[in-house]
């Protein structure tokens, strides 16, 4: 077994082809890693969220990392880590475009078609919670793999 580096094409392919990645953020002595749906356009990673710990931490410290992987078995996997800056998207038209791209990317993978993708979250009282749309502007990325 030997770890090897992914080349640029392999890194791009993994980022473009996966649906779920993990964002790592840190502020005020708290490190938080959470899975997210995302899209990647070759430059930036786009995600959505409701308010909460992840958004609070990224607003305080916009330096984040993003991890995505494909694990076929314990000795056959690949992983990419990207570092970058959290930027909240506030322009309505850009938010709508990103959300539509996210929906288009995710819809083919939804097994239960009775549950449509939402354009917002609903809290415990049934009230709609505003979606926060953001991007990670990638500054660096690297990838590794193992294949026996």
State where each predicted segment sits.
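Extreme N-terminal tail/first-helix region
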Residues: 1-17
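Short secondary-structure boundary/capping segments
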Residues: 12, 37, 56, 72, ...
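Short beta-strand segments
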Residues: 18-50, 66-67
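Short, structured patches in soluble enzyme cores that scaffold and shape functional sites
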Residues: 27, 70, 137-140
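Short acidic (Asp/Glu) patches
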Residues: 49-52, 62-69, 115-121
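Helix-adjacent hinge/juxtasegments
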Residues: 54-61, 65-83, 87
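Charged, gly/pro-rich active-site loop segments
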Residues: 78-148
């Amino acid at each position: 077994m030997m770890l090897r580096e992914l080349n640029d094409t392999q890194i791009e392919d993994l980022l473009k082809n996966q649906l779920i990645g993990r964002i790592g953020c840190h502020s005020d002595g708290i490190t938080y890693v959470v899975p997210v749906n995302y899209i990647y356009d070759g430059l930036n990673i786009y995600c959505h969220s409701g308010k909460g710990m992840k958004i609070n931490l990224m607003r305080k410290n916009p330096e984040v990392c993003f991890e995505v992987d494909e694990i076929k078995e314990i000795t056959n996997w690949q992983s990419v880590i990207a570092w970058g800056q959290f930027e909240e998207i506030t322009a309505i038209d850009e938010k709508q475009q990103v959300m539509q791209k996210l929906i288009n990317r995710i819809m083919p993978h939804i097994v239960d078609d009775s549950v449509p993708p939402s354009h917002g979250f609903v809290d415990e009282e049934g009230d709609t919670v505003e979606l926060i749309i953001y991007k990670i502007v990638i500054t660096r990325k690297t990838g590794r793999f193992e294949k026996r």
